[in-house]
Amino acid sequence: MIQPQTHLNVADNSGARELMCIRILGASNRRYAYIGDIVVAVIKQAV
């Protein structure tokens, strides 16, 4: 489960190393994001 302010490790070749979740889209009063949900995130650390 992912909630706002959660730091995530990135596993792709975009150059980002760490993200922080800001918002869960489509979830007005849901606290957590699950598999398949869309989240808005900011890059906290890059290559």
From Swiss-Prot:
Keywords assigned by UniProt, alphabetized: Chloroplast, Plastid, Ribonucleoprotein, Ribosomal protein, RNA-binding, rRNA-binding
Subcellular location: Plastid, Chloroplast
Keyword Ubl conjugation: no
Main subcellular location of this protein, as a coarse class: plastid
Domain of life: Eukaryota
GO annotation (BP), single: translation
GO cellular component, one term: cytosolic large ribosomal subunit
GO molecular function: large ribosomal subunit rRNA binding; structural constituent of ribosome
Function: Binds to 23S rRNA.
Subunit comment: Part of the 50S ribosomal subunit.
Family (UniProt): Belongs to the universal ribosomal protein uL14 family.
Protein's name in the database: Large ribosomal subunit protein uL14c
